[in-house]
């Protein structure tokens, strides 16, 4: 089972960026610390308030585990093979850690000594906990495997989404993953819904004009364990960033490069509806169990919310005065967090953590991120209601309820 905190980037395996933990509307910046390198994925938070960051550093440690409730005190750190910053660490409910590096998936116990390491073809995206202690690992070169999370042994069949991949060249196209270009077949982490057993991901096949969506089905206890169910080119301009699955596993939400938000049937990949955003969202939307969708972030975006009404989307509110740089992280029914441009006060520059009401878009609070540079890599919400954000330039900011 995943950790009770914020187990990995975008929260749960469905990439919903939602937690039932009631969010705090008042926050205090408790500590800030640098990873002494860069970050390309958000930090993960464990059930014990531990924080894991997968940094890219010029030397020394790169994978770090800190104590979020003790001023970021380091528990342990180690160095991974570099080049895999796009993969967020994943905590399970026993504080074991899973993280990808080019050519391997690695698991650590609550201490820094490796539990197991297994070779893969490519760079694993953020791994996903399935059922029965099984771990889904999808690499940027399109290899899909399931591992026993305790032993590290492979379970069932693998699925190769790309043909004729050279297994020895496991870093090929890796530089295209961050900007989501054609050289990286699987540039973003998959979404998994336990309710339906569906796994959905974006795939840019070699020679194809755009990235399409692919649906796989997970069959626990059966053979084959994984089957490829469908390929959808409904988003004709191509998909961008990780897809998100609804809580019941029936609908997949994804950004289109056509400045639209798309909803598709998870069972067959056929479109339900699309709605214009009037901007290109570079990070995934956030989705609540009640069907509220908050658009993703990126440069020149706006904060917009929609309600899934079945065969169409209804705009609930739009904030043209707010430009979110990150995916919004939603906590309970009434609180959302996003890193936005500027800050409190007229003419403010830099970045701030915005606290808002997802129901109506109203701003509740805003907290400046001191000396923040680069771009934000996401917002993580702990089960103790602490909120952590970080920047691509490696600065981590931890807030506590005030």
Can you annotate each of these PLM segments?
Residues 2-3, 7-40, 44-125, 129-402:
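Extracytoplasmic/lumenal domain signature
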């Amino acid at each position: 089972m995943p950790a009770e905190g914020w187990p990995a980037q975008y929260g749960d395996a469905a990439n919903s960026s939602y937690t039932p933990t009631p969010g705090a509307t008042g926050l205090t910046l408790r500590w800030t610390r640098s990873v002494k390198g860069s970050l390309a994925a958000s930090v993960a938070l464990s059930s014990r308030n531990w924080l894991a960051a997968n940094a890219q550093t010029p030397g020394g440690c790169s994978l770090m585990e800190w104590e979020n409730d003790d001023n970021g005190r380091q528990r342990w750190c180690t160095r991974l093979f570099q080049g895999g910053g796009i993969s967020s660490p994943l905590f399970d409910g026993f504080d074991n850690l899973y993280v990808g590096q080019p050519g391997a998936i690695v698991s650590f116990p609550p201490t820094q000594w490796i539990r197991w390491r297994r070779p893969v073809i490519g760079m694993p995206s953020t791994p996903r906990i399935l059922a029965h202690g099984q771990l889904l690992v999808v690499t940027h070169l399109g290899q899909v495997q399931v591992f026993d999370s305790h032993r590290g042994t492979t379970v069932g069949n693998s699925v190769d989404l790309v043909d004729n991949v050279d297994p020895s060249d496991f870093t090929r196209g890796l530089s295209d993953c961050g900007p989501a270009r054609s050289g990286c077949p699987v540039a973003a982490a998959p979404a998994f819904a336990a309710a339906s057993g569906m796994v959905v991901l974006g795939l840019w096949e070699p020679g194809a004009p755009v990235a399409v969506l692919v649906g796989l089905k997970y069959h626990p206890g059966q053979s084959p364990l994984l089957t490829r169910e469908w390929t959808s080119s409904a988003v004709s301009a191509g998909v961008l960033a990780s897809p998100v699955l609804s809580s019941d596993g029936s609908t997949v939400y994804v950004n289109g490069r056509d400045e639209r938000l798309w909803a598709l049937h998870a069972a067959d990949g056929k479109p339900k509806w699309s709605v214009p955003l009037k901007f290109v969202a570079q990070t995934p939307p956030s989705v609540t169990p009640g069907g509220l969708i908050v658009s993703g972030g990126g440069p020149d975006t706006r904060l917009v919310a929609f309600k899934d009404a079945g065969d169409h989307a209804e705009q609930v509110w739009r904030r043209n005065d707010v430009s979110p740089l990150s995916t919004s992280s939603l906590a309970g029914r009434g609180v959302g967090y996003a890193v936005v441009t500027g800050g409190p006060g007229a003419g403010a520059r830099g970045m701030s953590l915005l606290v808002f009401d997802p129901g109506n878009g109203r701003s509740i609070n805003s907290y400046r991120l001191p000396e923040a540079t680069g771009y934000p890599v996401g917002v993580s919400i702990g089960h103790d209601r602490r909120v952590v954000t970080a920047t691509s330039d490696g600065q981590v900011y931890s807030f506590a309820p005030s």
